[in-house]
């Protein structure tokens, strides 16, 4: 039998040629100088829609599915968004025990939230069918963001699917490199960029902004958002073409049940009591009053409407929103504040006695206790993900226990909201954290929300600043955060208001969070419940949040602590940083780590060594650090020709004396170099244990060191005659 051999490339091409994809379509465009391709009809045919997005060499498969029937007994839209990070996308095997990807990492959770926020408001408000969005990262080119691919692919998949949705949207990142705004910056550009803002928009409005920035001014941030919105129209046009050519008709769905007649009767009968119940700055009082009002509704209407209880949550929401909206459009708020008035503020540092730094920030009934901890760089968080970042030196974690909102519920591991808010505060402080060369510590801040009534994420930003300054971390500038809300009337007029509390967040249309210094913005996160923001609203929000954060800094934070403590806490580890020749690292570590383990045992210090020869020594006390440094200095010591050293005589020979310059490092003083005059015996000039000055005169090709006591003393006498002090 004749054996037929076929090359791999021939086999693959045969498979592709003979496999039929009758519904396959491919759409391409140029996006920021790189090719963007959207493919439909080749993968995941059983999903409502699936789009493979390829941008450069980054590939993300975006699939959307919807349940055929609505979920019973719920008053919310059950949307789930998952961003799956596959390590094969970057050519790596997971480091877990079973070598499988586990639960999503922090960056995966944050990207899921970035995709969720712009698409959620565009679903019908009474849609109750489960909808799943899954973006699987299959290949990563670090010059082309998987996050942007996920946003574009999700938009395209929802738009061409039969799922009711009022898209499409376009998405773009903007950087600031050498003072110029850059669309979708490359990996190298991101490393030097002062801005990383993701902007998602529809054909007319902006629906999502997520930003980290190095104290960027308002006008630069606004211009980046405006330019991104305009550029997004190209993607929207391409997806519009896809919808026209291959889009499916949207399916009909049962609209959420609601008794409008009952609602109107309740409004007419109890409007005055409802306004009285809402008009307070105390969350607990408001809720107690409203519960009493519900009892009155039962007395008035339960007999005629026996099923009214199933509508109570929706009635409460609509009724409260009606009141809050009317008041805000008239220029006042539920707690009596003006629209740009901040709730009462308080700040305190040094709250906890033995921690490295702590800060308590209070704004109305929102209260956050932030605690800073310093450790050696070995405590940096190691990251095993598809992203370029491999470790984090500054970490912020955010916790919201049940008692903070007056609820009796058990403690749970952090959810997506906690991870998202923690990352926002982390991003807000990152630009002012000192570089590792100036402050060689790993830094962790934990923000405990002990009372929650709106804007807790912004409270954690202010609390983090206080805790870091109390810990002696030399941040370059204090950072404050504030949120801005929005109410729009049917005629398009709008009102923005500052420092939203819980009830305003719940019933408002926007939560526009902005953090920064007096110099500029460090972070933005925008959540919406409407169909988007105009440029006028965005500019207004940027302006009023700047004024508000400056007010917070000037009135409460800086009077509390004007600048970072001059030294770290006495309970924080003491740190020394030194640099050695990288070729000497092996000598410091020793065979099997024997040398460094001995140094650690003798000194009690903790030692971290970088590949570039940077060594960080940490210990609870300075003496241990000094001992460890001395040991390392001795190991890496290399004598220099022409230099003077003060050493101990360790051995006598007939031809000279050996003098120890450092432990294990000695040189020979020939008998002719021991004294100014001729001597017959070495013992006539010195004995073992004597200390003497020597000068390095030569280091031969074998590394042997030749010394001279005679030359050293001659140089010392000359320096003393010139008035120099010899140490």
Question: Language model features by range: what are they?
Answer:
Residues 117-125, 160, 351, 376-379, ...:
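Conserved helix-loop functional segments at active or binding sites
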Residues 162-278, 468-566:
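Mobile "lid/hinge" segments at catalytic clefts and subdomain interfaces of large enzymes
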Residues 49-52, 144-162, 349-372, 453-473, ...:
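Conserved phosphate/anionic-ligand binding catalytic regions in large, soluble enzymes, centered on
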Residues 571-573, 582-727:
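Single-stranded RNA-binding regions, centering on S1/OB-family and related RNA-binding modules
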Residues 125-131, 166-168, 235-253, 284-285, ...:
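Flexible, glycine/charged-enriched surface loops at secondary-structure junctions
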Residues 11-67, 252-388, 573-587, 595, ...:
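Extended amphipathic alpha-helical scaffolds
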Residues 35, 47-132, 137-144, 203, ...:
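Glycine-rich, flexible beta-strand/loop modules in the N-terminal catalytic cores of phosphate-handling
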Residues 14-25, 31-34, 48, 59, ...:
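Alpha/propeptide regions of enzymes that mature by internal proteolysis
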């Amino acid at each position: 039998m004749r054996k037929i051999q076929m090359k791999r490339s021939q086999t693959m091409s045969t498979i592709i040629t003979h496999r039929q994809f009758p519904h396959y379509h491919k759409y391409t465009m140029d996006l920021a100088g790189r090719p963007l391709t959207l493919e439909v009809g080749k993968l995941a045919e059983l999903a409502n829609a699936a789009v493979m997005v390829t941008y450069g060499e980054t590939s993300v498969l975006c699939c959307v599915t919807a349940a055929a029937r609505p979920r019973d007994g719920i008053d919310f839209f059950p949307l789930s968004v998952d961003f799956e990070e596959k390590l094969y996308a970057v050519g790596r095997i997971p480091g877990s025990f079973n070598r499988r990807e586990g639960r999503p990492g922090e960056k995966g959770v944050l990207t899921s939230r970035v995709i969720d926020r712009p698409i959620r408001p565009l679903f019908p408000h009474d849609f109750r069918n489960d909808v799943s969005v899954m973006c699987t990262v299959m290949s990563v080119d670090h010059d082309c963001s998987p996050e942007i691919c996920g946003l574009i692919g999700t938009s395209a998949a929802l738009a061409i699917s039969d799922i009711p949705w009022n898209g499409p949207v376009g998405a773009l990142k903007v950087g600031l490199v050498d003072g110029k705004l850059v669309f979708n910056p490359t990996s190298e550009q991101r490393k030097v960029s002062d801005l990383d803002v993701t902007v998602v928009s529809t054909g007319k409005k902006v629906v999502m902004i997520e930003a980290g920035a190095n104290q960027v001014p308002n006008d630069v941030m606004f211009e980046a958002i405006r330019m991104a919105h305009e550029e997004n129209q190209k993607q929207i046009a391409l997806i519009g073409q896809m919808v026209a050519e291959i889009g499916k008709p949207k399916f009909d769905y049962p609209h959420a049940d609601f008794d409008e007649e009952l609602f109107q009767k309740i409004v007419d009968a109890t409007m005055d009591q409802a306004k009285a119940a809402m008009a307070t700055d105390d969350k607990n009082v408001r809720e107690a009053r409203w519960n009493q009002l519900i009892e009155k509704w039962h007395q008035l209407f339960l007999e005629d409407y026996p099923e009214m209880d199933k509508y109570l949550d929706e009635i409460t929401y609509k009724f409260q929103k009606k009141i809050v909206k009317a008041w805000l459009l008239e220029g006042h708020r539920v707690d009596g504040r003006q629209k740009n008035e901040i709730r009462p503020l308080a700040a305190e540092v040094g709250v906890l006695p033995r921690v490295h730094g702590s800060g308590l920030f209070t704004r109305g009934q929102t209260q956050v206790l932030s605690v800073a901890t310093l450790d050696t760089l070995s405590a940096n968080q190691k990251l095993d993900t598809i992203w370029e970042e491999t470790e984090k030196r500054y970490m912020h974690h955010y916790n919201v226990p049940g008692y903070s909102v007056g609820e009796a519920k058990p403690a749970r591991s952090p959810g997506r909201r906690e991870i998202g808010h923690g990352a926002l505060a982390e991003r807000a402080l990152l630009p002012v954290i000192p570089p590792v060369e100036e402050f060689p510590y790993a830094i962790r801040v934990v923000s405990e929300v002990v009372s929650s009534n709106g804007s807790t994420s912004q409270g954690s930003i202010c609390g983090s600043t206080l805790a870091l300054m109390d810990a002696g971390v030399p941040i370059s500038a204090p950072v404050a955060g504030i949120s801005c809300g929005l109410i729009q009337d049917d005629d398009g007029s709008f009102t923005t208001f500052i420092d939203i509390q819980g009830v305003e967040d719940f019933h408002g249309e926007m939560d526009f969070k902005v953090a920064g210094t007096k110099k500029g913005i460090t972070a933005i996160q925008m959540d919406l419940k409407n169909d988007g923001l105009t440029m006028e609203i965005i500019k207004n929000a940027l302006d009023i949040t700047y004024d508000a954060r400056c007010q917070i800094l000037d009135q409460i934070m800086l009077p509390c602590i004007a600048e970072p403590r001059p030294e770290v806490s006495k309970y924080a580890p003491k740190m020394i940083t030194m640099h050695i020749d990288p070729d000497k690292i092996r000598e410091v570590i020793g065979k099997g780590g024997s040398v460094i383990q001995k140094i650690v045992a003798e000194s009690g210090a903790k030692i971290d060594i970088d590949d570039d020869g940077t060594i960080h020594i940490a210990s609870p006390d300075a003496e241990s650090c000094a001992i460890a440094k001395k040991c390392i200095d001795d190991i890496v010591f290399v004598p220099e020709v022409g230099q003077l050293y003060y050493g101990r005589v360790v051995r006598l020979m007939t031809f000279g004396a050996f003098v120890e310059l450092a432990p294990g490092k000695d040189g020979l003083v020939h008998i002719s170099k021991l004294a100014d005059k001729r001597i017959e015996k070495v013992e006539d000039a010195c004995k073992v244990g004597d200390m003497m000055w020597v000068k390095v005169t030569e280091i031969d090709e074998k590394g042997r060191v030749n010394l001279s006591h005679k030359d050293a003393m001659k140089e010392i006498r000359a320096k003393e005659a010139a008035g120099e002090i010899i140490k």
